[in-house]
Amino acid sequence: IQKEGLVENAAELGKYMLEQLYLLKEKHSTIGDVRGRGLLVGVELVLNQEEKTPANDLAEDVLYRCLNKGLSFKLSMGNVMTLTPPLIIKKAQIELSLEIIDQSLSEAEKAL
């Protein structure tokens, strides 16, 4: 872990991923919250920003759209996308993952 610099990689890329997800939150009203530490990140999907009504059906739709595009993650509590990439992930892979999430959210929001 030390030899490969995995802790530093997780801190650096985790910060980058959170910054990019905060930008996606500004674009998508269905993102109610983004939280995380290192490469463990949660993205809460909601129907209503003010009341934070959980968007379980939307989250499931986004999950399957992402899976069809090659991105796998876990849903927690029905509406929280739990992103836990490997510690060896590269920035380009995070960028691709974020593109997939952005596209899938846009598609699922239109289908609401």
Model-inferred region functions:
Residues 1-112:
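Conserved N-terminal phosphate-binding loop of PLP-dependent enzymes in the Aspartate aminotransferase
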